[in-house]
Amino acid sequence: MSQSDLESSMRKSVEATQRNFNTIRTGRANSSLLDRISVEYYGAETPLKSLATLSTPDSQTIQIQPFDISALALIEKAIAMSELGFTPNNDGKVIRINVPPLTEERRKEFCKLASKYAEEGKVALRNLRRDAIDKIKKQEKEGEFSEDQSRDAQDSVQKTLDKFIAEVEQHLATKEADILKV
């Protein structure tokens, strides 16, 4: 695995962690809160984003405008059944969700969830490091690398890991500050 391949894989892992962070409520309306909702539409699980336009007309409201009005009730049901705790308001044309302010207890729960996502991201990064170092050691055994080259390559992999873990930590700190801001 080349250095650029490793960095690319680690970048994707950090981006996946960032997407997970985006699904956590911060007290303000954000359409990405609904990213994980899928709707049973014509017998298939379909992502909400594929069925409707999501917008945030103000800081406390998410508006969902379905492309097909017949999907309105299905979308409403999927949101109500989700773990987000939102109550959708259906007016026959659009669905509006009022995002209530977070309680202190919910803020702490969401901070814990953000920490969990960050830890999962770090584990994924460490797994990539382990795979890269295993390949380097294998190449050293096969004689492709000298001992010094192997050590240098392993140090480079570790420095790359440290850089990306620091990035995950920075994203976590930003998200926690966002969650705790009243």
From Swiss-Prot:
It comes from the Bacteria. Transmembrane segments: none annotated. GO terms for molecular function: ribosomal large subunit binding. It is found in: Cytoplasm. GO terms for biological process: translational termination. Pfam families: RRF (PF01765). Responsible for the release of ribosomes from messenger RNA at the termination of protein biosynthesis. May increase the efficiency of translation by recycling ribosomes from one round of translation to another. Belongs to the RRF family. This is Ribosome-recycling factor.
